[in-house]
């Protein structure tokens, strides 16, 4: 989860988020080098006494500043396309969970089980227990098995919402009349927090998401107790 005054991304918990973090660092380094080069050229132009006011044609320079940006864009595009394909790839999911956005709560249905569904509301500040997080705790957490591919089917009953869990690299729009899907895979157990990331009305800020990733045995015990 995010902390006050945090710099950088949240710790990666899924393979997709690890790839996104690496791509972020890769792109940031390219942007830093370009910015440094531009700043150096500007300082050079401001401090040098030499001028070339009569220069009308410089084909070598024009060739360089045409080819170089194209190469840089390719270096950014190739890893980006690879990650996009990885995010859309879903192979043999172990579990499917249907997520519906409402004003202003989430409802979940485990489609592989009969009658395993519930609504998830934010816990009001006055009802929080010591150690619980304001605006992030819910009355019903989404319990999922770790280290297994899980398919999330995401839609909405009313207006646009967005189901997002940053530490897992997830952000999928919930659109009325349309079913989007995403893959959830966690490398370790724990609680992972998210929020609705699409302005959806007056209580938009009060739609938290809490995923509880547990070992498979614990998940089986939980699902048996819920049915």
Swiss-Prot record:
Localisation per UniProt entry: Mitochondrion inner membrane
Bilayer topology term: Multi-pass membrane protein
GO biological process terms, semicolon-separated: ATP synthesis coupled electron transport
Chain sites annotated for binding Cu cation A2: 196, 198, 200, 204
Pfam families per the UniProt record, alphabetical: COX2 (PF00116), COX2_TM (PF02790)
Coiled-coil stretches: none
Enzyme Commission code: 7.1.1.9
UniProt KW keywords: Copper, Electron transport, Magnesium, Membrane, Metal-binding, Mitochondrion, Mitochondrion inner membrane, Respiratory chain, Translocase, Transmembrane, Transmembrane helix, Transport
Cofactor(s) the protein needs: Cu cation
Cofactor annotation comment: Binds a dinuclear copper A center per subunit.
One GO CC term on file: mitochondrial inner membrane
Residues where Mg(2+) binds: 198
InterPro entries registered for this protein in UniProt: CcO_II (IPR045187), CcO_II-like_C (IPR002429), CcO_II_C (IPR034210), Copper_CuA (IPR001505), Cupredoxin (IPR008972), Cyt_c_oxidase_su2 (IPR014222), Cyt_c_oxidase_su2_TM_dom (IPR011759), Cyt_c_oxidase_su2_TM_sf (IPR036257)
Segments on the Mitochondrial matrix face: 46-59
Transmembrane segments: 15-45, 60-87
Subcellular location, principal: mitochondrion
Reactions catalysed according to its record: 4 Fe(II)-[cytochrome c] + O2 + 8 H(+)(in) = 4 Fe(III)-[cytochrome c] + 2 H2O + 4 H(+)(out)
Domain of life: Eukaryota
GO MF annotations in UniProt: copper ion binding; cytochrome-c oxidase activity
Binding of Cu cation A1, residues: 161, 196, 200, 207
Family: Belongs to the cytochrome c oxidase subunit 2 family.
Binding partners and assembly: Component of the cytochrome c oxidase (complex IV, CIV), a multisubunit enzyme composed of 14 subunits. The complex is composed of a catalytic core of 3 subunits MT-CO1, MT-CO2 and MT-CO3, encoded in the mitochondrial DNA, and 11 supernumerary subunits COX4I, COX5A, COX5B, COX6A, COX6B, COX6C, COX7A, COX7B, COX7C, COX8 and NDUFA4, which are encoded in the nuclear genome.
Function field: Component of the cytochrome c oxidase, the last enzyme in the mitochondrial electron transport chain which drives oxidative phosphorylation. The respiratory chain contains 3 multisubunit complexes succinate dehydrogenase (complex II, CII), ubiquinol-cytochrome c oxidoreductase (cytochrome b-c1 complex, complex III, CIII) and cytochrome c oxidase (complex IV, CIV), that cooperate to transfer electrons derived from NADH and succinate to molecular oxygen, creating an electrochemical gradient over the inner membrane that drives transmembrane transport and the ATP synthase.
Stated name of the protein: Cytochrome c oxidase subunit 2
Source organism per UniProt: Anisomys imitator (Uneven-toothed rat)
Gene name per UniProt: MT-CO2
């Amino acid at each position: 989860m995010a902390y006050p005054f945090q710099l950088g991304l949240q710790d990666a918990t899924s393979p997709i988020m690890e790839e996104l973090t690496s791509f972020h660092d890769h792109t940031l380094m390219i942007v830093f080098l370009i910015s440094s080069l531009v700043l150096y050229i500007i300082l050079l132009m401001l401090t040098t006494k030499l001028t070339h006011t009569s220069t009308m044609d410089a084909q070598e320079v024009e060739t360089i500043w045409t080819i170089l940006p194209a190469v840089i864009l390719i270096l950014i595009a190739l890893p980006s396309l690879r990650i996009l394909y990885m995010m859309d790839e879903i192979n043999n999911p172990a579990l499917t969970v249907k997520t519906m956005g409402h004003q202003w709560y989430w409802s979940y249905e485990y489609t592989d089980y009969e009658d395993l569904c519930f609504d998830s509301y934010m816990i009001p500040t006055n009802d929080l227990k010591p150690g619980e997080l304001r605006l992030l705790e819910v009355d019903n957490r989404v319990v999922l098995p770790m280290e297994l591919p899980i398919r999330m089917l995401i839609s909405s009953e009313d207006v646009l919402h967005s189901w997002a869990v940053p530490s897992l690299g997830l952000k999928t729009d919930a659109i009325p009349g349309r079913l989007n899907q995403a893959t959830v895979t966690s490398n370790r157990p724990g609680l992972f927090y998210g929020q609705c990331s699409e302005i959806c009305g007056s209580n938009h800020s009060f739609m938290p998401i809490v995923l509880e990733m547990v070992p498979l045995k614990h998940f089986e015990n939980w699902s048996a107790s819920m049915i």
